[in-house]
Swiss-Prot record:
It comes from Rhizobium meliloti (strain 1021) (Ensifer meliloti). This is Flagellar M-ring protein. The chain crosses the membrane at residues 23-43, 436-456. The gene is fliF. Residues 280-296 have a biased composition (Basic and acidic residues). Its main location: membrane. Belongs to the FliF family. Keywords: Bacterial flagellum, Cell inner membrane, Cell membrane, Membrane, Transmembrane, Transmembrane helix. It is a multi-pass membrane protein. One of its GO terms (biological process) is bacterial-type flagellum-dependent cell motility.
Length: 557
């Protein structure tokens, strides 16, 4: 039966149903289709989990826009302050929102003064409003730093009093929501920012911590000591040298074929040097002083002897000539003062100086053998090692004068066996565990669809004449029903008996179906159905088989 015949049969069956049955059939079809669609939508509806709760209206709006732009399904809670996303999308959604600094509830800043009336406002309220506004403005500025999602600032201003002995200083604390790396790197900048924004606030009086309660920076933090700062300088120098060596060797060796270790000994002592330099060539005569002294003296000694007569008063006798002596002295002192140019140099060194470097580089022997080619000659490998040692020395700035050491060896790497193997993917059980919810939903949907088709659509199709084999058998077996051989139907069924006999190869005058022979007819009617069926099979096996197939289809329906 072709498609046109099936369509004709379908329209004929519909016309035979009547208006009431057609309406019932249409309602049943609509209900079945709606049930299947509703079940499919409900079963495949993704389950949601909470992303954020207790959000403000502005945050909900911004988060909804961001999720919609990223094609992430979401639902807003009935309270208007919570957002839900599909299960498994929480981490992705939070990372996406963190990149945009959401949620970021607005901190009140200087706009607080716009809503405060001056009438009846006490000095205490003015001070509190000023501190709140300052905290909000500083928090807004901190949130502008890349990687910081939210921030809160608390400032304690000193109370003013006339009878206080010691002067109080302001203090501040800052809480940020950011990753550990960003928080630690930005802690020092945040401290200086807050200290510069509050009058009289010292950097050591600012404490910074993250949302997990971990202290990032404080005044008594041991990490701010001179020792830890020196260790940080050493680590930075070592990592910088390792990076330079990696950049020099990676292009032809590959990052997985060598390992570098640098040990640096630094001198981080602070030095203060002050020196004065004089220029003797630039002297200028400033003053001259000259002192002259002359001394003269003479002495004469008489030649008379000392007697008693010399003591008697009498005219003084003339003495004889004695010894004479004279002295002369002359002194001259000259002093000249000069002005000389001088230069005073004061040097303060807070940096570091490298005292010694020790560098160790281990290279994968397999990579060197591949570079040397076949056969792998040891001389070629040694030549490569010498060239790489020169490269390492130049990249690290090795100075043999200060005792720097570079050691470069070729070894067999164990990691190369692992690097050649692909990373195994998740197992079957792991995949089933991850997708268990989706599998259950799919199986439930298939089961519901099967039940609807089996108990609803299949009987309906059978009633309308669908099912190609059943319709074909019904068409072929039309007119093959067993005739009524009873006497009551003899008068009206003469033509039927005649047709039935002709179907099985008999004419109207055949004595087997002759209605005139009532005795023989009654005898055949009294025979059981098995006997009559056997006679029909004997007459025409093919047509009897068609009738049996039709009976089997009707019984199954």
């Amino acid at each position: 039966m072709n498609l046109f015949d099936q369509f004709s049969t379908f329209t004929k069956n519909l016309s035979n149903l009547g208006q009431g049955k057609l309406i019932a059939l249409a309602v049943a079809g609509v209900v079945a289709i709606g049930f299947v669609l509703g079940a499919g939508i409900y079963v495949n509806r993704p389950s949601f989990e909470t992303l954020y709760v207790g959000l403000e209206r502005s945050d909900v709006t911004q988060i909804s826009i961001a999720l919609a732009e990223a094609n992430v399904d979401f639902e807003v809670g009935t309270d208007g302050g919570s957002i839900q996303v599909p299960v498994g999308m929480t981490g992705k959604a939070r990372l996406l929102l963190a990149e945009r600094g959401l949620p970021s509830s607005a901190n009140a800043g200087y706009e607080l003064f716009d809503n405060v009336g001056s009438l009846g406002l006490t000095s205490f309220m003015q001070e509190v409003t000023r501190v709140r506004a300052l905290e909000g403005e500083i928090a807004r500025t901190i949130q502008q730093i890349s990687g910081i999602a939210a921030a809160r600032v608390h400032i304690v201003m000193p109370e003013r009093g006339s009878f206080r002995k010691a002067e109080q200083t302001p203090t501040a604390s800052v809480m940020i929501r950011a990753s550990a790396t960003v928080g630690r790197s930005a802690a020092s900048s945040i401290r200086h920012l807050v200290a510069s924004s509050v009058p009289g606030l010292d950097v050591d009086d600012v404490t910074v911590l993250d949302s997990t309660g971990q202290l990032l920076a404080s005044g008594d933090d041991p990490s701010n000591s001179a020792l830890n700062q020196s260790l940080g300088v050493v680590q930075n120098v070592q990592s910088d040298l390792e990076k330079k060596i990696d950049n020099a060797l990676a292009p032809f060796l590959g990052m997985d074929n060598f390992r570098t270790s640098v040990t640096a000994r630094l001198n981080t002592d602070a030095q203060q040097i002050q020196e004065t330099v004089f220029d003797p060539e630039s002297r200028v005569e400033r003053s001259t002083r000259v002192i002259k002294e002359e001394q003269k003296s003479s002495q004469q000694q008489p030649d008379n002897a000392a007697t008693v007569q010399q003591n008697v008063p009498q005219a003084a006798p003339r003495g004889g000539a004695g010894q004479q002596s004279s002295d002369e002295a002359e002194k001259k002192e000259e002093q000249t003062n000069y002005e000389i140019n001088s230069k005073t140099i004061a040097t303060v060194k807070n940096s570091y100086s490298i005292e010694r470097l020790s560098i160790a580089v281990v290279v994968n022997r397999g990579r060197l053998a591949a570079m040397a080619g076949e056969p792998a000659d040891q001389a070629k490998i040694d030549a490569y090692l010498q060239e790489m040692q020169k490269i390492v020395s130049s990249a690290a700035g090795i100075d043999p004068g200060r005792g720097d050491v570079v050691t470069l060896n070729a070894m067999d790497f164990v990691e190369t066996q692992l690097l050649d193997q692909a990373v195994p993917g998740p197992g079957i059980m792991e995949m089933l565990t991850r997708n268990l919810g989706g599998i259950i939903n799919a199986l439930a949907f298939v089961a519901v669809a099967f039940l609807v088709v089996w108990f609803g659509m299949r009987p309906l199709a059978r009633q309308l004449g669908f099912g190609g084999q059943a319709g074909k058998l019904e068409g072929e077996a039309a007119g093959l029903e067993l005739p009524d051989f009873s006497p009551a139907g003899a008068g009206a069924g003469g033509a039927l008996m005649e047709g039935f006999g002709s179907d099985f190869g008999f004419d109207g005058g055949d004595d087997l179906l002759n209605l005139g022979d009532e005795a023989g007819f009654n005898r055949r009617v009294k025979e059981g159905p098995e006997r009559r069926l056997a006679r029909m099979v004997e007459i025409s096996e093919e047509r009897a088989a068609k009738i049996l197939r039709k009976w089997a289809v009707d019984r199954a329906a």
